[in-house]
């Protein structure tokens, strides 16, 4: 007898990569939505993402959510 397998539900991750625009210089930078370290702008050095233990708190404008 062949073994029947039911549907396997695989949960999708809640974390994504996001593109953030720096409010000071306008530089766009890709970072992780659940960043564990402070993310600074590569051009001017302003803090763009502050870790909170879960999702990061973003100081810049989120331009796009990448998948």
Curated annotation (Swiss-Prot):
<comment type="subunit">
    <text>Part of the 30S ribosomal subunit.</text>
</comment>
<dbReference type="GO" id="GO:0006412">
    <property type="term" value="P:translation"/>
</dbReference>
<dbReference type="InterPro" id="IPR000592">
    <property type="entry name" value="Ribosomal_eS27"/>
</dbReference>
<dbReference type="Pfam" id="PF01667">
    <property type="entry name" value="Ribosomal_S27e"/>
</dbReference>
<dbReference type="InterPro" id="IPR023407">
    <property type="entry name" value="Ribosomal_eS27_Zn-bd_dom_sf"/>
</dbReference>
<dbReference type="GO" id="GO:0003735">
    <property type="term" value="F:structural constituent of ribosome"/>
</dbReference>
<feature type="binding site">
    <location>
        <position position="41"/>
    </location>
    <ligand>
        <name>Zn(2+)</name>
    </ligand>
</feature>
<keyword id="KW-0479">Metal-binding</keyword>
<keyword id="KW-0687">Ribonucleoprotein</keyword>
<feature type="binding site">
    <location>
        <position position="25"/>
    </location>
    <ligand>
        <name>Zn(2+)</name>
    </ligand>
</feature>
<dbReference type="GO" id="GO:0005840">
    <property type="term" value="C:ribosome"/>
</dbReference>
<keyword id="KW-0862">Zinc</keyword>
<keyword id="KW-0863">Zinc-finger</keyword>
<feature type="binding site">
    <location>
        <position position="22"/>
    </location>
    <ligand>
        <name>Zn(2+)</name>
    </ligand>
</feature>
<feature type="binding site">
    <location>
        <position position="44"/>
    </location>
    <ligand>
        <name>Zn(2+)</name>
    </ligand>
</feature>
<dbReference type="GO" id="GO:0008270">
    <property type="term" value="F:zinc ion binding"/>
</dbReference>
<protein>
    <recommendedName>
        <fullName>Small ribosomal subunit protein eS27</fullName>
    </recommendedName>
</protein>
<keyword id="KW-0689">Ribosomal protein</keyword>
<dbReference type="GO" id="GO:1990904">
    <property type="term" value="C:ribonucleoprotein complex"/>
</dbReference>
<dbReference type="InterPro" id="IPR011332">
    <property type="entry name" value="Ribosomal_zn-bd"/>
</dbReference>
<comment type="similarity">
    <text>Belongs to the eukaryotic ribosomal protein eS27 family.</text>
</comment>
<feature type="zinc finger region" description="C4-type">
    <location>
        <begin position="22"/>
        <end position="44"/>
    </location>
</feature>
